[in-house]
UniProtKB/Swiss-Prot annotation:
Pfam families the UniProt entry points to: HisG
Pathway: Amino-acid biosynthesis; L-histidine biosynthesis; L-histidine from 5-phospho-alpha-D-ribose 1-diphosphate: step 1/9
Assembly notes: Heteromultimer composed of HisG and HisZ subunits.
Role description: Catalyzes the condensation of ATP and 5-phosphoribose 1-diphosphate to form N'-(5'-phosphoribosyl)-ATP (PR-ATP). Has a crucial role in the pathway because the rate of histidine biosynthesis seems to be controlled primarily by regulation of HisG enzymatic activity.
Keyword field contains Amino-acid biosynthesis: yes
Protein name: ATP phosphoribosyltransferase
Enzyme Commission code: 2.4.2.17
Length: 204
């Protein structure tokens, strides 16, 4: 039995779409029909559905053998896991966004402090970072900050709130991670699951 931690929300929707494409229907249908369940079983696999930022913690602590999580989470801090594979879904990017007329940044709101700090330092720009845990766009709309650093997929949310993308920071994609001990103890099961996803170790 493999236990897999999957990030809820947008990334899981992307995973389900990908599973449909490769016709891994048993797992896809199980995830689609989950209702409010957070623990699902199918095909000798147990899925735990958790907040994205918690996926590497469950894997690190040995509560999950495998995790599927966005690279944005892994970029924010170091985890004691095997950061194994790029996955062919979940593509988006980090960006600086602000009102169209904004040209200078003194104060930035973000949920991704490390990413924002690294970016502005690389540009030689001294900014005050305000950490928020949700609705980051609102901070830009009400002028609490000069701009935001957030994840952009289509730009629809930015546009709906009168913000525009100013700078592309870095690309994001889904990653497959494993618990270090499980990678050896359950290597055959893990490799079998990876093959079922039609990805290769060459994607590391």
């Amino acid at each position: 039995m493999l236990r897999i931690a999957i990030a809820k929300g947008r990334l899981m929707d992307s995973l389900i779409n990908y599973l449909d494409v490769i016709e891994y229907t048993t797992l896809s249908e199980t995830l689609k029909n989950r209702e409010r369940q957070l623990l699902l079983s199918v095909d000798n696999i147990e899925c735990i559905l958790v907040k994205g930022s918690d996926v590497p913690i469950y894997v690190e602590q040995g509560m999950a053998d495998i995790g599927i999580v966005g690279s944005d989470i892994l970029d924010e801090r170091q985890y004691n896991v095997n950061n194994l594979l790029n996955m062919p879904f979940g593509a988006c990017h980090f960006a600086v966004a602000a009102k169209p007329e904004t040209t200078n940044y003194r104060k930035i709101a973000t949920s991704y402090v490390h990413t924002a700090e690294t970016y502005f330092k690389s540009k030689g720009i001294d900014v005050e970072l305000i950490k928020l845990n949700g609705s980051v766009e609102l901070a830009g709309v009400v002028d609490m900050v000069d701009g935001i650093v957030d994840i952009v997929q289509t730009g629809t949310t930015l546009k709906a709130n009168g913000l525009v993308e100013k700078q592309h920071i870095s690309d994001i994609n889904a990653r497959l991670i494993t618990n270090k001990a499980a990678y050896f103890k359950k290597s055959q099961l893990i490799e079998q699951f990876i093959r079922s996803l039609e990805v290769s170790i060459a994607n590391a």
